[in-house]
Regions:
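Conserved N-terminal Rossmann-fold NAD(P)-binding element of oxidoreductases
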Residues: 3-9
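N-terminal Rossmann-fold NAD(P) dinucleotide-binding loop
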Residues: 12-15
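Aromatic pocket-lining residues of Rossmann-like dinucleotide-binding sites
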Residues: 19
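Helix N-cap at the beta1-alpha1 junction of Rossmann-like dinucleotide-binding domains, i.e.
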Residues: 33-37
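Hydrophobic/aromatic anchor residues within beta-strands of the central parallel beta-sheet
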Residues: 50-52
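Conserved Rossmann-fold cofactor-binding substructure of NAD(P)-dependent oxidoreductases
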Residues: 54-72, 76
């Protein structure tokens, strides 16, 4: 399953941590307004299935574009 998590704060980091222990997650993009924050969340899980992206969640078109690029099965 390909997943996209919007927000790399406490909840986003917790989701990434749990997902890193689930073999059915084939890839997960952690996105945040601040790319550094998303990159830090990815670095914490130390898993090549995870990647970081930048998105302004207040802009619907930004979210749509990220969904097109990431092609996730689920968006959180």
């Amino acid at each position: 399953m390909k997943a996209l998590v919007i927000g790399a704060g406490g909840v986003g980091r917790a989701i990434a941590n749990i997902a890193s222990r689930r073999p059915f997650i084939s890839s997960m993009v952690i996105a945040d307004r601040h790319l550094v924050r998303a990159e830090e969340a990815v670095a914490r899980v130390k898993d090549s299935r995870f990647s970081a992206a930048q998105v302004n969640a207040a802009e619907l078109e930004d979210i749509r574009e990220l969904i097109r690029r990431a092609d996730p099965d689920v968006v959180i």
